[in-house]
């Protein structure tokens, strides 16, 4: 690798919306995420609807599912 052309690789704290935090390495010092392995339905086995900008409500209204 060439010297002084690569970004600095530092410790990073990743924070999930559920409150879970963990450490990793990145060129950023802090990363915020919406879903992690502690709250993702695949890993927890529970159902959780992830709504992006009201898409679920729009779908329910369109097909009268309320």
UniProtKB/Swiss-Prot annotation:
GO biological process: translation
Entry keyword annotation includes rRNA-binding: yes
Protein name stated in the entry: Large ribosomal subunit protein bL31
Functional note: Binds the 23S rRNA.
Organism of derivation: Campylobacter curvus (strain 525.92)
GO MF, any single term: structural constituent of ribosome
GO cellular component, one term: ribonucleoprotein complex
PANTHER family: 50S RIBOSOMAL PROTEIN L31, CHLOROPLASTIC (PTHR33280), LARGE RIBOSOMAL SUBUNIT PROTEIN BL31A (PTHR33280:SF6)
Residue spans crossing the bilayer: none
Cofactor binding note of this UniProt entry: Binds 1 zinc ion per subunit.
Family: Belongs to the bacterial ribosomal protein bL31 family. Type A subfamily.
Binding sites annotated in the UniProt record for Zn(2+): 16, 18, 36, 39
Cofactor dependence: Zn(2+)
Quaternary organization: Part of the 50S ribosomal subunit.
Keywords: Metal-binding, Ribonucleoprotein, Ribosomal protein, RNA-binding, rRNA-binding, Zinc
